Amino acid sequence: MSKKTYYILSFTWGLPLTVCGLLVAIVLMILGYRPKRFGWAWYFEVGRHYDGLSIGFIFFCGKYASNVTKAHEYGHSIQNTKYGWALVFLTLASAARYWYYTVMEDWLGKKLPDYDSWWFEKQATETGIHYILTPDKK
């Protein structure tokens, strides 16, 4: 995928999440946050140890987020260009799963399967890493 295709698909097929991401970005910029680039996506560092959240081609992560976390969120932005409107529902399921994992592992000490065991999360990580390591591949 080219950069041009990424943005065309983000503003057409992936428009619902792109608009939501832009609205959140505007609020954050009003509050003094400044966007940074990661691949073709824009991101904001919010908090210190926040994991991450992608909304369209914009994602949010903590100040100390690893490059793997950023690549994972970047992968979700690429999924937005692939799944478009359906990604709204996958994102809601992903958010519910994230909070389930947080409660079960962090609060209750339960051991759960790897976070990337769900195809959607695994695909985001693999896609994000692929595009960061080989951005000129189409």
What do the PLM-derived regions correspond to, one by one?
Residues 74-92:
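Catalytic Zn2+-binding segment of zinc metalloproteases
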